[in-house]
Design a protein with these regions (language model features):
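Short functional linear segments
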Residues: 1-53, 60, 66, 70-71
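ATP-dependent carboxylate-amine ligase catalytic core
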Residues: 22-29, 33-46, 70-156, 174, ...
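Acidic, Mg2+-coordinating active-site environments of NTP-dependent enzymes
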Residues: 46, 118, 136-143, 158-245
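A general structural signal for well-ordered alpha-helical segments in protein cores
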Residues: 7, 32, 61, 102, ...
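N-terminal-biased segments
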Residues: 2, 7-26, 86, 142-146, ...
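Aromatic/hydrophobic pocket-lining residues that form π-stacking "cages" and hydrophobic walls in ligand
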Residues: 64, 128, 208
Length: 246
């Protein structure tokens, strides 16, 4: 398939949330684990920072990638959604994944994807992890797509987990209270792995503390940090919180 044909096929695998509603939301990570087994576990070859949150996770992910790149690391960045080109989701040091790699990945594995009903998101994550592993990057910044606990990215064991903030988003899938949504996003907290919390409320802080305690994970609150001001192309007062988190 050509690149446009490959994209057309990929986008046809998008979950039809608008038509199916909550039933289109996969309830576990079985498919992703199956995919990683099939690909030879590229995720286990990566050093990662995992970023979740309602708002600010994209900006924070890009800032983290920029800081680490300036420090001399080869940095993979996986984010979603894209603005113009699907390849914006997967970058190394700011350079988009090549069209040929996308086409070859899909063409090589299409039969497996179809046989196992892989979703667009699962295939995108598999593509990113496979690309980063083959390019032998130093570190990957992985942004959660939706929620956290059941997101396709939540198969990594990161160096640190980051949760920027909690708002009422995707309530049909994640719950209709801040505490319920916080619990879903706190699902990225791993055993003995530190977690940084960008912002919290009286409803969400107990959730973060309880989840971190259950996982024996050190927890750090960005609000406790007196951040040194540094220049950024990202404008808006809310970016101050993102800078503190980073």
């Amino acid at each position: 398939m050509t690149y446009p044909e490959t994209l057309n096929w990929l986008f046809n695998q998008l979950p039809m949330y608008q038509l199916q509603g909550a039933s289109a939301y996969k309830k576990d990570l079985t498919n992703v684990h199956l995919l990683m087994d099939y690909l030879g576990h590229p995720e286990s070859q990566l050093q990662c920072i995992h970023v979740a949150g309602t708002n600010g996770k994209g900006s924070s992910s890009h800032m983290l990638a920029s800081v680490l790149q300036e420090a001399g690391y080869q940095v993979g960045l996986y984010t979603s959604p894209h603005l113009k080109d699907f390849r914006e989701r997967i970058k190394i040091n700011g350079v988009l994944i090549p069209e040929d790699f996308v086409c070859d990945f899909v063409n090589q594995h299409q039969a497996f994807f179809e046989a196992n009903d892989m979703s667009f998101f699962e295939m995108s994550v598999g593509l990113a992890f496979d690309y980063f592993a083959k390019e032998k990057i130093d570190i990957a910044i992985i942004e959660v797509g939706m929620g956290g606990r059941l997101d396709a990215t939540n198969i990594i064991t990161p160096l640190v987990s980051v949760i920027t903030n909690i708002g009422l988003d995707h309530t049909q899938f994640l719950g209709n209270t801040l505490a319920a949504i916080a619990a879903e996003k706190a699902g990225i907290i791993k055993s003995n792995i530190p977690v940084v919390i960008g912002e919290y409320t009286s409803e969400t802080q107990p959730v973060f503390l309880a989840t971190a305690k259950a996982n024996h994970s050190p927890v750090y609150f960005a609000s406790d940090v007196i951040a040194t001001t540094f220049p950024s192309d990202l404008i808006g007062d809310y970016q101050i919180h993102n800078k503190k988190t980073v």
